[in-house]
């Protein structure tokens, strides 16, 4: 039995009912999260419970664990786990340099800026001479990402899901760039998994005909709290 599975089985009983936010659970939760990262596992409930306990018990706050939680939830994109994790961190904590670096990575992925992400990972990124430049020390980003097993693969799968809803056809050269310079074999594996059809001797992939798959749906607007606040303030 893996360390994560063993700790999770203990926590499944320990964080139920009124005992969920018992501060005595923090140490076990942190150990479980560290095992979760190293074994490339995932449990949203454990991550969210830990952040809530940090809110309720500021003396227990552990920034190193919060960084791991943010990175693990980021790996679930396009699900909203990362957004939830961000909003469970007290505003007095979010300005720390270490968390800001994580948030800058998250902002790249939330905006689907895969090209910059992979340039950072390859060491090709050159920071701008600008006060707003988020990656003044680009060499730190690969160290953060490579310490989390499966992160790069999760970004590739996220990119594939974005491609699925964005492109009808995509050139192979662009596809390779969006997936971080993968090999021809890997491109074929992703194409097979997502049902993309090679055309023009494999230089273009047909993704899907979006016009033929349009469905009526209810659209739920998701506004960030700061945007919502500014909208309300303007109308007061």
Swiss-Prot record:
Compartments where found: Cytoplasm
Entry's Gene Ontology BP terms: formation of cytoplasmic translation initiation complex; regulation of translational initiation
Keyword Metal-binding among UniProt keywords: no
Main localization of the protein described in the UniProt heading: cytoplasm
GO molecular function, one term: translation initiation factor activity
UniProt KW Protein biosynthesis keyword: yes
InterPro entries recorded: ARM-type_fold, CSN8_PSD8_EIF3K, eIF3k, PCI_dom, Transl_init_fac_sub12_N_euk, WH-like_DNA-bd_sf, WH_DNA-bd_sf
Gene3D superfamilies for this protein: ARM repeat, domain 1, Winged helix-like DNA-binding domain superfamily/Winged helix DNA-binding domain
Entry keywords, A to Z: Cytoplasm, Initiation factor, Protein biosynthesis
Domain PCI stretches: 42-222
One cellular component (GO) term of this entry: eukaryotic 48S preinitiation complex
Entry similarity comment: Belongs to the eIF-3 subunit K family.
Function: Component of the eukaryotic translation initiation factor 3 (eIF-3) complex, which is involved in protein synthesis of a specialized repertoire of mRNAs and, together with other initiation factors, stimulates binding of mRNA and methionyl-tRNAi to the 40S ribosome. The eIF-3 complex specifically targets and initiates translation of a subset of mRNAs involved in cell proliferation.
Cited HAMAP family: eIF3k (MF_03010)
Subunit field text: Component of the eukaryotic translation initiation factor 3 (eIF-3) complex.
Name the UniProt record assigns to this protein: Eukaryotic translation initiation factor 3 subunit K
Organism: Brugia malayi (Filarial nematode worm)
